[in-house]
């Protein structure tokens, strides 16, 4: 039997179903209107927020490379040059360009005391002929020294020293043969024992004359005047700043391995003539005080002790030349002694040539370091006795 689908017939059951459907449509429509009203009348657009597709990324830390710092080269600064006085080692403002002045100093007992020798950078003592002993004072700048002397005549050995240091030699005349010898050596010098009406470069000490000094012991040089007079005479007073004077200095020249030498005694001895000099160390002064003729020397103008930072004794081959005047072999050199700060060592010395410079060395050949300050230099014949401290050591 075949079944047959038939549409439901109208009746009560069918009407109820239709009513339910109609009500559902109305409800849905009402809800839709309410939603429209909420969104804005007449505006059917709906703002839809789409889900964000962005995502949080952890902050990226880039590897930071420190900027490459090129090594900076500081501009090279040349050290400021240090200029020193060639005869005393003291610091000066600029290159040394002055010519040294040397003055012949009377050293006979009757002529004492000296005047102005404490202001010399170097004071030398030596036999000059037979038994006559004199001094030679060297000044890098004599202009501040009001009086120097007393002044006596020049000698051959003074001309030798003048050539070693290229000095302007100041003297009170001299033997004709000695003056001729100086000229042959190329020494520039002049005699201050001449008519100087205005006392520009020299004067006679009237007080000495009244005190009974001999006329030959009363002549003095004026430091500023001798430079002025040299200029007036056309004598060169400047110097090559690169000139080598041969001397080396340090702030403390006390010999490290030296023997104690609270006093140093030298007996100048040549051809039967003798003269004693003793240098006595004064710890308070830090200098050796000059003693001769049984007494300590003082400056006749200031009353200050005549004292020196350095004591140098040069034992030289000596000979007679030109009527008994002495000459030393500076180029051959020899041995000697150096005392400073209360100690003493043996040394060697020689000049490079007759034009210098004069050099001092230790026994092992190192340059001798003098203490900054003034120096006493004795030039004595080989064989002149030297003793120090208790006299237990002697050089013959």
Name these PLM-found stretches.
Residues 1-60:
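Gram-positive cell-envelope targeting signals
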């Amino acid at each position: 039997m075949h079944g047959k689908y038939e549409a439901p017939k109208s009746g009560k059951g069918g009407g109820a179903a239709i009513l339910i459907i109609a009500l559902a449509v109305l409800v849905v429509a009402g809800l839709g209107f309410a939603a429209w009203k909420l969104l804005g009348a007449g505006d059917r657009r709906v703002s839809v927020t789409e889900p964000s597709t962005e995502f949080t990324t952890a902050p990226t830390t880039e590897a930071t490379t420190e900027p490459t710092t090129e090594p900076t080269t500081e501009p090279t600064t040349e050290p400021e040059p240090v200029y020193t006085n060639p005869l005393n080692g003291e610091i000066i403002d600029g290159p040394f360009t002055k010519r040294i002045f040397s003055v012949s100093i009377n050293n006979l007992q009757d002529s004492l005391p000296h005047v102005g020798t404490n202001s010399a950078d170097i004071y030398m003592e030596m036999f000059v002929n037979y038994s006559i002993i004199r001094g030679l004072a060297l000044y890098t700048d004599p202009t501040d020294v009001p009086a120097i002397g007393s002044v006596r005549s020049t000698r051959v050995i003074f001309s030798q020293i003048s050539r070693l240091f290229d000095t302007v030699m100041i003297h009170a005349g001299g033997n004709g043969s000695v003056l001729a010898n100086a000229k042959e050596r190329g020494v520039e010098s002049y005699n201050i024992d001449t008519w100087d009406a205005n006392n520009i470069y020299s004067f006679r000490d009237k007080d000495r004359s009244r005190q009974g000094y001999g006329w030959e012991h009363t002549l003095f040089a004026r430091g500023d005047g001798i430079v002025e007079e040299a200029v007036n005479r056309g004598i060169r007073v400047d110097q090559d700043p690169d000139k080598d004077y041969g001397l080396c200095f340090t702030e403390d020249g006390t010999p490290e391995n030296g023997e104690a030498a609270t006093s140093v005694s030298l007996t100048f001895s040549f051809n039967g003539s003798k003269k004693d000099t003793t240098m006595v160390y004064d710890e308070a002064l830090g200098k050796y005080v000059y003693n001769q003729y049984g007494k300590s020397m003082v400056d006749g103008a200031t009353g200050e002790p005549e004292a020196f930072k350095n004591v140098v004794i040069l034992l030289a081959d000596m000979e007679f030349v030109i009527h008994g005047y002495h000459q030393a072999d500076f180029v051959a050199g020899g041995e000697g002694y150096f005392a400073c700060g209360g100690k003493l060592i043996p040394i060697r010395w020689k000049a490079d040539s007759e034009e210098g410079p004069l050099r001092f060395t230790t026994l092992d050949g190192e340059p001798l370091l003098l203490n900054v300050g003034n120096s006493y230099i004795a030039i004595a014949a080989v064989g002149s006795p030297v003793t120090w401290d208790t006299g237990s050591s002697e050089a013959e």
